[in-house]
Amino acid sequence: MEETRIAFKKNFSINIDGLDLEAKEGEIGSIPRWLAQILEENNSIEIQDTDVLIYISRSLNRERISKPHDLSGIDLDFYIRANDFIKRLKDKEKESIVVSLNSFVTSRIEKIVKLAAASALSVDLEKKLSAEEKELYNFIHKYSLEFKQRAVNRYE
């Protein structure tokens, strides 16, 4: 479970399912993302976004410089983290990152389609994909195989 850096806005103490959390106002720490979202809604914490912006920027840059037939690695929860970050931005701030992410996604989809049409998902490639991309890869692979079989079987 991915953790998020946060700053506490007030003194805090909680025990949820064996997770003990105690902090004073102003302290900085890391907690599971799901808990951070709940506490942020209750105005108990502030999520530290700078780390996420750096993380997203690095991922975008790695993909941009990767070879046309190679996918750069991203974390399993990349899109979840990116979307959580975007939700907290003001409209003016969202525009440039959303444009960059759309370009990133388009590039990755093109590569995934080519790779999935050619072969099943390898262990090495699986490590480079997010959860959503794995699902897309397997979907494309399955249906491209079915299409190839139907297209070729017409002549037998």
For the regions a protein language model found, what residue spans apply to each?
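N-terminal, Lys/Arg-enriched amphipathic/low-complexity engagement segments
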Residues: 1-14
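Functionally constrained cores in energy, signaling, and assembly domains
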Residues: 4, 29, 40, 94, ...
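Short, functional N-terminal and low-complexity linear motifs
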Residues: 4-7, 46-51, 68-69
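Generic hydrophobic secondary-structure signal
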Residues: 6, 23, 31, 39, ...
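Compact, well-ordered interaction domains used in eukaryotic information-processing assemblies
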Residues: 11-53
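Charge/polar-rich, low-complexity and marginally structured segments
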Residues: 51-156
